[in-house]
Amino acid sequence: MSNILGLDVGSKTIGLASSTGNVAKKEINLKFEEWNFEEGVSLLTEFIKDKSFDTFVFGYPKNMNGSIGERAEMVDYFIEGFMVYNPEIKEEQIIRIDERRTTKMAKSIMIEAGLSRQKQKENKDTLAAQLILETYLEKIKK
């Protein structure tokens, strides 16, 4: 099985999760100045440089009606910058997974686990990335 990185890209954070098999595990949350995607891409590039990821699964936040909205366009913009910084990564290595409701699911999981508001804030993006990656892993299992 391949080495896969799941990503939940926001306006000032990138939650990361990884998998080398059937299970997604949380990695880290990269923080950057709000809307400074060049900084976000740089941090992500630094994170992956000594790792051998061959698939990158980006959460793609479609609107509830399935259309592409501002948040999905933001992810497309981020991916474009990521590929410019990392020309060795090819388009076929980039996967976009519909991530409607993953952040809400992550919050529900953390509330049920009894995490404090501070812990929820710290972990919501990495947990969302883990859920995005698990969605992809389930999809490729079929």
UniProtKB/Swiss-Prot annotation:
InterPro entries: RNaseH-like_sf, YqgF, YqgF/RNaseH-like_dom, YqgF/RNaseH-like_dom_sf. SMART domains: YqgFc. GO terms for cellular component: cytosol. One of its GO terms (biological process) is rRNA 5'-end processing. Transmembrane segments: none annotated. Could be a nuclease involved in processing of the 5'-end of pre-16S rRNA. This is Putative pre-16S rRNA nuclease. It comes from Mesoplasma florum (strain ATCC 33453 / NBRC 100688 / NCTC 11704 / L1).
